[in-house]
């Protein structure tokens, strides 16, 4: 984790396993205040050495009274710092100070109406009623001594509490999730109103610190960069190239799972445009042989991740002195793969598929950033908009957009349909409004009629979502006439397709990718 210069105010977030914990840090950074996520096992002395302005306890999937419950160093409460407990964090604080936590009659998940009963600093200038996002199975049923009820909801009589004399605050809901309509304001009240932070964190600070960190880590050694042409790997390549110049060699692996025209575009942009040393490896046959007959999505991801590293290993053996491998791993990649405390949603290609005998040391300069921060970073580095605003594309590529076994025919269907979708979205001027859009092949066939003949062909799914950081997302309301054009074109122009469906599921409960 990057430690910035002492003049920057910092809020520490302790990780108790919530899938939303990175969002807390993200929200705080949006306010211009630096925030770091640390494991709940961090000691009070370690926190004191960081000189933070305040601490936030994240939520988590455990019960504070259950076996294996996660706790923190009790001396943290003696530091005299403001503490804000969210969900599990509030329950932990309650238990620590002698209150009561019990299992709820039923798990509460979704939107709820919060009623503010006591206007503590946390609720300053906020409406008395507001919609919040609940996700919990336990409740605080008895307040600790010195605490008062700040807020209630229909199913949660103690939805918020505080002990303002000690600057201790807790909420049962998740203000960091955008479904909580005044969540940002509530966190802002803690950061500025309670902790007294000042703005000072920005991407220029990040670049300054990260360049220094890369140079210090690499020294006179050489780095291989896994270049795909997507936003993340492009920013990594340019950032590292800025730090160490020709000590960087980019390897572009064409695994046969790329979008239409992608391979040619990558070579033109980085080899010719940025004057980087880019080695292209044609590994289509190698990947397809490994993936033959494989249907399980987790197995596919790990095979693709392993093969990537082995390809790099093979290429590195042909080069001299390659010690480091650079990857575009983001905060969101890590949280979706599960931390020591978070439950795994799915293994990520940058963090879940690495072989144990890997010969490289990893450099992941973006692993403290969210996608929108990466785009800002890319712009600061002078990367053209067409790359900075390129569609997010997973490392396994079309391999996880073909559900089940991958074949050349299925890949071609996804590749061509995706190209049509992207073309029409850009034509409609929606490419900056929609966070991510792509087609997927669920593998099911259905009956249709084309040219007075019966067909039995594939269904193509369209996925398009709006989001800020990829941690939560809503399905995009694409105009019907645009959807109609996309549907007509795909059915008419892509062989073996006779039906189009549109995914209208948000995240959560679904993830953005289908596998």
UniProtKB/Swiss-Prot annotation:
Pathway: Purine metabolism; GMP biosynthesis; GMP from XMP (L-Gln route): step 1/1. SUPFAM superfamilies: Adenine nucleotide alpha hydrolases-like, Class I glutamine amidotransferase-like, GMP synthetase C-terminal dimerisation domain. The active site is at 87 (nucleophile), 174, 176. Keywords: ATP-binding, Glutamine amidotransferase, GMP biosynthesis, Ligase, Nucleotide-binding, Purine biosynthesis. It comes from Bacillus thuringiensis (strain Al Hakam). Residues 201-390 form the GMPS ATP-PPase domain. PANTHER family: GMP SYNTHASE [GLUTAMINE-HYDROLYZING], GMP SYNTHASE-RELATED. NCBIfam families: guaA_Cterm (TIGR00884), guaA_Nterm (TIGR00888), PRK00074.1 (NF000848). Catalyzes the synthesis of GMP from XMP. One of its GO terms (molecular function) is ATP binding. It catalyses: XMP + L-glutamine + ATP + H2O = GMP + L-glutamate + AMP + diphosphate + 2 H(+). Its EC number is 6.3.5.2. Residues 10-200 form the Glutamine amidotransferase type-1 domain. Homodimer. ATP binds at residues 228-234. InterPro entries: Class_I_gatase-like, GATASE, GMP_synth_C, GMP_synth_GATase, GMP_synthase, GMPS_ATP_PPase_dom, NAD/GMP_synthase, Rossmann-like_a/b/a_fold. GO terms for cellular component: cytosol. This is GMP synthase [glutamine-hydrolyzing].
